[in-house]
Structure formats: structure tokens, C-alpha cells
Amino acid sequence: MAKIQITLTRSIIGRPETQRKTVKALGLTKMHSSVEVEDNPAIRGQINKVSHLVTVKEL
């Protein structure tokens, strides 16, 4: 499968707990931190929940 790079571009301060947990589950901890993960439906679902906080780049 393809890999995607996810970057946290907006802060989680003041966001609901569910969004904070989703960002943490994606492996993002600090602003502008990035992770490379396999592209699968589970990851895409998590990205959709916090799409306003992250940017996604296909590798």
C-alpha cells in the first residue's frame, strides 16, 4: 500500500477530548510534527475526524 505523511498544522488546545485522542492515536504530539503511515481505511477515517487540524501528503 501507499504511504502518507500526516502533519499537525493546528493546535489541539481548546479542542474536544475525542479530537485530542485521535491526534494522539495518529502519533502526532507537537505542532508541525509529522508521521509516515500506511494508507488504509482506518487511518483515513481518523484523518477525516481531524481534517481541520492536519495536512496530508501522499508519498
UniProtKB/Swiss-Prot annotation:
MF-aspect GO terms: structural constituent of ribosome
UniProt entry tagged with the keyword Ribosomal protein: yes
Disulfide bonds: none
InterPro entries in UniProt: Ribo_uL30_ferredoxin-like_sf (IPR036919), Ribosomal_uL30_bac-type (IPR005996), Ribosomal_uL30_ferredoxin-like (IPR016082)
Gene3D superfamilies: Ribosomal protein L30, ferredoxin-like fold domain (3.30.1390.20)
Pfam families, per database record: Ribosomal_L30
CDD domains: Ribosomal_L30 (cd01658)
Gene Ontology BP terms: translation
GO cellular component, one term: cytosolic large ribosomal subunit
Keywords noted in UniProt: Ribonucleoprotein, Ribosomal protein
Quaternary structure and interacting proteins, as annotated: Part of the 50S ribosomal subunit.
Family: Belongs to the universal ribosomal protein uL30 family.
Protein name in UniProt: Large ribosomal subunit protein uL30
Organism for this UniProt entry: Macrococcus caseolyticus (strain JCSC5402) (Macrococcoides caseolyticum)
Gene: rpmD
